[in-house]
């Protein structure tokens, strides 16, 4: 609606996790660097947490794009509301294990072990990425722990990255998950953006969408956007989009605080 008015090719603040719009802010870069180094060293089990809307899914997608497909075999589970059998089937499917429908739970575990050994022999590290991991049922978390038992004398056959909301931390703190918790080698918590990062976030997303020129959001508008969103990128997107619409409706190319 307002794209042509502001000289944009597309909407800059859409809510879909498009990695073209991943802004290279320090918190995101630190998280991606941690993931790349830890996975490169075969460090096994990594947990990334953050509030709803802080960019976990976008980072997960970015990691999928960054990792070398010749070095890594990736398995991505966007919907973890799975039974233990469903989990093994989903991982087996991602790793191209054949005939999984005919296998029971133990048969699947054996088939997965063989496939993981085969991939390791070919020099490929297997990484399982689970988004919205706080939704994993308790029995499936235990099944995940058993999957991480698969190893050779030298290395783990399966590395795991969990992306989840803060509830995941609370779940893993429970006594029944202490063995799984002890396997986590690295953790990272995504924080809300401060005003400086939020301003850069707005500018870079506008630039990716085709905007050229001075920042259309005035300083007071940026402060209002940060305050209203709490620095949460998803909420920042929603408010920025609505503010552009209001300014467009008034025929104004500068968004000030009354538009927010």
Language model regions located:
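Conserved Walker B catalytic segment
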Residues: 113-162, 175
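Walker A/P-loop nucleotide-binding motif
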Residues: 42-63, 80
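Helix-loop-helix "sensor" segment of P-loop NTPases
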Residues: 97-98, 118-122, 127, 152, ...
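Central P-loop NTPase core of STAND/AAA+ ATPases
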Residues: 95-120
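A short, basic N-terminal segment
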Residues: 1-42
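Conserved NTP-binding/hydrolysis module of P-loop NTPases
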Residues: 8-13, 71-74, 82-101
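A short beta-strand-to-loop transition that corresponds to the Sensor-1 phosphate-sensing loop
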Residues: 51-52, 132, 162-167
